[in-house]
Amino acid sequence: MAGASERDAGKPAASGAGAVPKTKGRKVQGGRVVESRYLQYDKKTKKVSVAAKGEKPPTEGRKASTVPRSREESKVMGTSNLQSTMLEGHGLNPPDLDLSAIDDKSMSRKAPQLERSVAGTDKSTSLLRPDQKRTLRKKRRDLQETMDMMESQTLLMTLLSVKVENNLALLEEKAEKDLAAMCHEKERLQRQALELRRQLLLRQKHQELAAALDAQTEVLSPLPPVLERFKEEYKTLGRALDTTRHELSMQAVHMEGSGQELLDDLEPALRTTLQLLGDLSICSPEDSAQVQGASTQQPGASAQLNCLLKELKGLVAEKDLELCRLVSQVVELSSQASKEAALTNQEVWEEAQGTLTSSQGYFSPDVRKDHSPTQDRTNSSSLDP
């Protein structure tokens, strides 16, 4: 029942913003009337709120209408706890209250800027003519359509962006596969290029070797006659060495005693050899008879012969070793003589042919350019024994 009392108490507020309640100046019969605290509001706030809404202050004897005058006013007021309670409690009959004077907490929570904009819009709407109102409604409808269109376009753009992302992922995967294939192909081509380069370098080297061989063949083409003459001279040198082998000087060979002592030591061995050759019917009978006569004249000749045979065997072994050493020395001397003969023939040929002709057989064209006659004389002097 508190709502009914509040409704009854709120009716005198419709007399105006500057009106004083009538209960103060009149005597109430039949009881005492207590002033409601609900009506203790700030008069200045009420005037400002009424002026902001563009309404005329209510006069005495006329009740102010509490029904919202437009959709904007209902939007501005919102749904407060007081209004919802009254609507739920009384159904379709709204209370006859001036809600403009109520200091509602839900209204105070709204931003001041929004209140000013909505108040200005309501005021301008209430002051416009009908054609201007229609234009304003049309603009609002156009604005709503534009917003709907922008929302639909935003949705389409979102769908397109999702589709683009999916396509981009597929393209990235495909590009990675193509890139891997290209890398494998690049490696294969690099290996093939390296193999071809190696083959090319090998062919170039073979061509250079063939050119060098051709140049050497051209340089050595006049040498066969000289080679034949060298062979003949070498054979002559070999025959000369064979004929003069026993007259060559012996060096670095240790021999005890002189030549006569060696001959005296060889005499008994030669006699034993002569006897053995006679026994084998190789020696002449006279020599064998002389040996036998000498053996019969001297007593103990058989024992001496045995001793001589033993000595002969020892001497043969020693002479065999000495002959081996002598043969090795003779071979070494022969090689040195051949070397000296070859160097002599080479020097003679170089002097006969000249420096330029002889340098063609020893040096390449690049070396021949830097080769001077002074170096030729130095080389020839170093080759002389």
From Swiss-Prot:
* Subcellular location(s) of the protein: Cytoplasm; Cytoplasm, Cytoskeleton, Microtubule organizing center, Centrosome; Cytoplasm, Cytoskeleton, Spindle; Cytoplasm, Cytoskeleton, Spindle pole
Q: Does the keyword Lyase apply?
A: no
Query: Where Phosphoserine occurs, residue numbers?
Result: 100
The UniProt regions of compositional bias labelled Basic and acidic residues, in chain numbering, are: 1-10, 53-75
Task: Set out the biological process GO terms recorded for this chain's protein.
Answer: cell division; centrosome cycle; spindle assembly
**What ranges does the record give for the region Disordered, renumbered to this chain?**
1-78, 107-128, 356-385
On this chain, the residues bearing N-acetylalanine are: 2
| Record keyword Hydrolase present | no
Keywords attached to this Swiss-Prot or TrEMBL record, sorted alphabetically, are: Acetylation, Cell cycle, Cell division, Coiled coil, Cytoplasm, Cytoskeleton, Microtubule, Mitosis, Phosphoprotein
Q: Which GO terms describe its molecular function?
A: microtubule binding
Q: Name one GO cellular component term.
A: cytoplasm
Coiled coil (UniProt feature): 131-248
**Feature: compositional bias, Polar residues:** 375-385
Q: Which family does it belong to?
A: Belongs to the HAUS8 family.
| Complexes and interactors | Component of the HAUS augmin-like complex. The complex interacts with the gamma-tubulin ring complex and this interaction is required for spindle assembly. Associates with microtubules. The interaction with microtubules is strong during mitosis, while it is weak or absent during interphase. It is unclear whether this interaction is direct or indirect. Interacts with EML3 (phosphorylated form) and TUBG1.
- Protein function: Contributes to mitotic spindle assembly, maintenance of centrosome integrity and completion of cytokinesis as part of the HAUS augmin-like complex.
Q: What's the protein name?
A: HAUS augmin-like complex subunit 8
Q: Which organism is it from?
A: Rattus norvegicus (Rat)
Q: Which gene specifies this protein's sequence?
A: Haus8
